[in-house]
Design a protein with these regions (language model features):
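Alpha-helical solenoid repeats of the armadillo/HEAT superfamily
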Residues: 1-3, 14-15, 29-52, 77-96, ...
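Buried hydrophobic core positions in alpha-solenoid tandem helical repeats
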Residues: 20-25, 69-73, 112-117, 157-159, ...
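Alpha-helical scaffolds that organize eukaryotic protein assemblies
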Residues: 17, 68-70, 109, 154, ...
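Intrinsically disordered, serine/threonine- and proline-rich low-complexity regions
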Residues: 1-10, 23-24
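Helix-turn-helix repeat elements of alpha-solenoid scaffolds
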Residues: 64-65
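Recurring C-terminal helix/loop segment of individual leucine-rich repeat
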Residues: 10, 59, 102, 147, ...
Length: 358
């Protein structure tokens, strides 16, 4: 019990286990014998397991110069599905810190992973697809990698899997796109105008059996708006029926998702209120905002963004009528004495706006 499993992993690496495993892989990779195939699987699985420890992973990476890292790279273009899988999982594990990710992208790993994905678009090998997408998602986290990966065509490569009916693949696909467009306005606009993608997102927002896919679809819808700030993107999302999902997302139990939804909705209200008006009304946004502002448990940023949104919604006649009918002034004036200064300030501004409008 005194040993953490990370310590054990590091000791196994230092004791030379990796070299033994690589030798087994070398010996069994071209064999069709059942026991060899099973040995290959065990050895490559163990290899991936050792990389789950932070120190053992960093030791084997050796700044990207490590012979082990190089050997694992050579698994990705291999003809063995088992080695392709282990190679992609190993890269996803090496890609757990920014330094490693930046080094790998600068040294051409992205093309190798895209080639691997290309080999599996049609055959539906879910485990390999999932592993390669996991690696790409992790590699896309550092800011400097995003533009490089976008210009290498990663978004297009990932979109080939939009047709997939497998939730694990859908989940990683969504996560990869969301990482790629973070603060990348042009890419967010391009993807946000892609009707096929947006329609698929709206469909997945209803995937009640797969909370992960549902959550990621909502977050990507919101991200497309937040990072593009584009009227065209908003129109595409309105036409595809995405507004109601963003309104529902504002009631999520996760503050980060609530906030992403409110910021996206505020952009919609600022840029395309007339287009979205009907959908916002039908989704009962005004009632939801009233609830968020009245609820003592709402986080300060939720209260702040809800008030910003109310100020924007007043620009629409039907929505303004709803705001007036719901006694917002009372709720907002209470927030003027909120302990959070930003919330209190926004409450004063909102109160003035509401008073003028009434």
């Amino acid at each position: 019990p005194c040993y953490s499993s990370d310590v054990i992993k590091l000791q196994l690496v230092e004791a030379g286990l990796v070299e033994c495993l690589l030798e087994i892989v070398q010996k069994t990779v071209d064999s069709d014998k059942e026991e060899d195939i099973s040995e290959l699987k065990t050895a490559s699985d163990l290899m991936v397991l050792l990389l789950l420890g932070d120190e053992s992973m960093q030791k084997l990476f050796e700044g990207g110069k490590g012979s082990v890292f190089q050997r694992v790279l050579s698994w990705i273009p291999s003809n063995s599905h088992q080695l392709q899988l282990a190679g992609a999982l190993a890269i996803a594990n090496f890609a757990r810190n920014d330094g490693n990710c930046i080094h790998m992208v600068d040294n051409g790993i992205v093309q190798k992973l895209m080639d691997l994905l290309d080999r599996h678009v049609e055959d539906g090998n879910v485990t390999v697809q999932h592993a390669a997408l996991s690696a790409l998602r992790n590699l896309a986290i550092p800011v400097v990698n995003k533009a490089k990966m976008l210009s290498a065509g990663v978004a297009e490569a990932v979109l080939k899997f939009l047709r997939s009916e497998m939730p694990p693949v859908q989940f990683k696909l969504l996560g990869t796109l969301r990482m790629l467009i973070d603060a990348q306005a042009e890419a967010a606009e391009q993807l946000g105008k892609n009707v096929k993608l947006v329609e698929r997102l709206v469909e997945w927002c209803e995937a009640k059996d797969h909370a992960g896919v549902m959550g990621e679809s909502n977050r990507l819808l919101s991200a497309l708006i937040r990072h593009s700030k584009s009227k065209d993107v908003i129109r595409t999302i309105v036409q595809s029926g995405g507004i109601k999902h963003l309104v529902t997302m504002a009631t999520s139990e996760h503050v980060i998702m609530q906030n992403e939804a409110l910021v996206a909705l505020a952009l919609i209200a600022a840029l395309e209120l007339v287009t979205a008006e009907k959908d916002l009304e039908n989704a009962q946004l005004v009632q939801i905002l009233h609830r968020l502002l009245s609820d003592d448990r709402s986080a300060p940023e939720i209260k702040y963004n809800s008030m910003v949104l109310i100020c924007a919604l007043i620009g629409s006649e039907p929505l303004q009528k709803e705001v007036q009918s719901m006694a917002f002034l009372e709720v907002v004036s209470k927030l003027r004495s909120h302990e959070n200064k930003t919330v209190a300030q926004q409450a004063s501004l909102t109160e003035q706006r509401l008073a003028v409008e009434s």
